Amino acid sequence: MFDRTQLSRRRFLSNFAFASGAVATGVGSWVIPAPWANAAEAPIKVGIATDLTGPIAYAGTADANVAKMLVKQMNDAGGLLGRPLELYIEDTASNESVAVGNVRKLIQRDKVDMVLGGITSSMRNAIKDPIVARGKTLYIYPQLYEGKECTPYLFCTGPTPAQQCDEFIPWLIKNGGKKFALPSANYVWPHTLNVYARKVIESNGGEVVFEEYYPLDQVDFSSTVNRIISNKVDVVFNTVIPPGVGPFFKQLYEAGFLKNGGRLACVYYDENTLNINQASEIEGLASCLDYFKVLTKENPFDAKIQAAYEKDFPGNFLFAAGSAATGTYRGLKLWEAAVKEAGKVDRDSVAAALDHAKIAEGPGGPAEMVPGKRHCKMKMYTAVAKGGNYEIVGRSNGLVDPKEC
């Protein structure tokens, strides 16, 4: 089984850069030049800052691939405002100190017109000031996250706790039980998400048996597993991330948690992360996201997006919601709509248009920014892992409000 938690630079290059015409401009830096050599005006510069190496490189590589696919589609359709788009990509390397230096390259050296990227909340917090405050550049953050990010000129296009918990947790109580454990990675997203999740659990008659935080590189969870089993926990609401999540789920399975009727839940789990464990080890795991691949069977536009991505990027780095690929798609298309409305690419003009931008079609359905909130309404889906795939078991009634800012 391919280990998604390890991705070498050589593997990345073979998957993305050399295969796609990208030109290396330094260590961890690539550019895909504007395709029109005789363009009358200078290209619009799109910056992508994401994890191309490190523990969550499977997600960052997919996000970079989505950006490449969409920028090519935009250029093939004539660009924006009659100008071609040029794509600049920086590796944030799952390392905040490295990321800050590389993001500065996008701002100071490449002078991009916008930056999209960051996966973990700690990464967003590290790079937002170099982009927005010091760099005076528009920033789009595409990943599901813990909420409360209300920085001007920073727009969030992934799901928030309200979108992921308000309907999902009552479903878990009905289809799992009332006794919850909250095992968590020790960084900002789990801490803040758990505050919200606990309120929803308790307001719906559930109980949080325990809430624990672990180092991001921890792989031995024997004491946690024992605590879950001995306390007869019904639902494990997990926010442990790679590399620890695979060993944790395996240890839970081996202790009989699933066999005894326990329910796994993880709101970032998508098709990429399904493959971290053997299917039997996470059978019945429930997730709540803005898109699952199984939607392609019922939605022609989802099928079109998925087919285009898989044609351009066959292999191990999947188009999936928990990896921020859908938020990347949504963010770039909303930005495109804003640029068209603004008729220019300066930060203030685009931000004013992006504040109320809408797209009629996108992964999982339409989406629209909530005016004045810099967050996005979208459809949400609850799915359960069965035999190594997902099955939709619930869906929102229309677009769900992010309830932020």
Stretches found by the model and what they are:
Residues 47-66, 90-96, 119, 183-191, ...:
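Extracytoplasmic "Venus flytrap"
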Residues 106, 110-119, 140-142, 181-184, ...:
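Periplasmic-binding protein-like
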Residues 58-65, 78-148, 157, 215-221, ...:
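Beta-alpha junction/loop-to-helix N-cap segments that form part of ligand/metal-binding clefts
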Residues 29-50:
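C-terminal segment of N-terminal export signals and the immediately downstream linker at the start
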Residues 311-326, 332-392:
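Segments of small-molecule ligand-sensing domains
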Residues 1-34:
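N-terminal secretory signal peptides
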Residues 98-101, 146, 152-255, 295-304:
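Extracellular/periplasmic Venus flytrap/periplasmic-binding protein
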Residues 252-329, 396-402:
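Extracellular/periplasmic periplasmic-binding protein-like sensory domains
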